[in-house]
Amino acid sequence: MAHATIDEIEERCLLVAVIHGGVDERLAHEYLDELAFLAETAGARAEFAFTQKLPFPNPRTYVGEGKLQEIKVYADTHNIDAIIFDDELSPSQIRNIERELNRKIIDRSILILDIFAKRARTFHAKTQVELAQLQYMLPRLTRMWTHLERQKGGIGMRGPGESQIETDRRIIQQRIALMKERLKEIDKQMTIQRGNRGQLVRVALVGYTNVGKSTLMNLISKSEVFAENKLFATLDTTVRKVVIDNLPFLLTDTVGFIRKLPKQLLESFKSTLDEVREADLLVHVLDLSHPNFEDHFETVNTTLQEIDKEEKPTIIVFNKIDSFSEEVSLDELKRTWMARLGGRPCIFISAVDKTNIDELKQVLYHEVQRIFKIRYPYNDFLY
């Protein structure tokens, strides 16, 4: 059985997005740039992008019929392999679009899932990704079979028949049950591990994907965590014991968030995200050099609220000041954000050239010390 993923050989693709909900032109272009980066990370090359302003995506074909024909003409004349859409498509939308375009159709969710599958290194991460992929595939079985038949030269829309689809549905449901059982066992082990960490305050690095969390983790903990200038370079949770001025605490590097993160991933990565839920302090890292960093800030906050309703103490870290090149001055930006954050600690750093890293460590020290004193007011460890 086949399903739409990016192949190892670089594929030529088109990007398609519906602009709605009051999104301005500048933001729409930045969204497309992100989609192109996702495609590149997965191994594809974006040749051209189509956008259409609509109040909401067309329930049948995502874009209007006229725009779909434009896409078809371009794809036919430019030898395009795949069409990538900037939203999760319903099974019927994928079926209708494939029928019109006769191309591999990839929506945003399967694109991100494919990247996660490439990035997964450990048994834990691979199990979480497989569960998310299976949950995505289950309602789309009919479409996947017709896609396979067309690849093999099948006539029209003939599929393998209802009985074969039902058999595959049962197989996938059984596999989903197995993955959930495996994750349940891993959850138990991780819960025990967290319980064994004792009284140490837990600090979690959070942020949009590719903002420099792993580089910062390496600097603070003086250990080597995989860091790369690619989306979702970190999937596995890394926990390190850090000591600053004789004050020990645990520092966790977590998977990066992204706009329109597939709901299947939030569900299957529960045990990984538990590190965020159970943290005492969050360090929210932002890429100050990114033109859309304010939107990233809101995306991460929204995702954090989805996975944990409790508001935690947070340090806001503005990273990559070495690459900051906006018209507004850095001092003016600092004043604006310090006022906006209403007293929450924030600091401007560069993890690459190590600017203000010592200051960040001092902010961390004071916040961890404050949390420890509240939790253990009669403990003489800090006095």
Question: Where are the regions that the model predicts?
Answer:
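Short alpha-helix plus adjacent loop in nuclease-associated cores
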Residues: 110-129
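N-terminal accessory targeting/assembly segments
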Residues: 1-113
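Switch I (G2) and immediately adjacent beta-strands of P-loop GTPase domains
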Residues: 45-48, 57-58, 230-260, 281
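C-terminal-of-GTPase-core extension/linker across diverse P-loop GTPases
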Residues: 1-15, 36, 135, 139-211, ...
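Flexible beta-alpha connector loops of hexameric P-loop NTPases
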Residues: 22-27, 58-61, 119-124, 164, ...
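Conserved nucleotide-binding/hydrolysis micro-motifs of P-loop NTPases
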Residues: 19-23, 54-56, 88-91, 110-113, ...
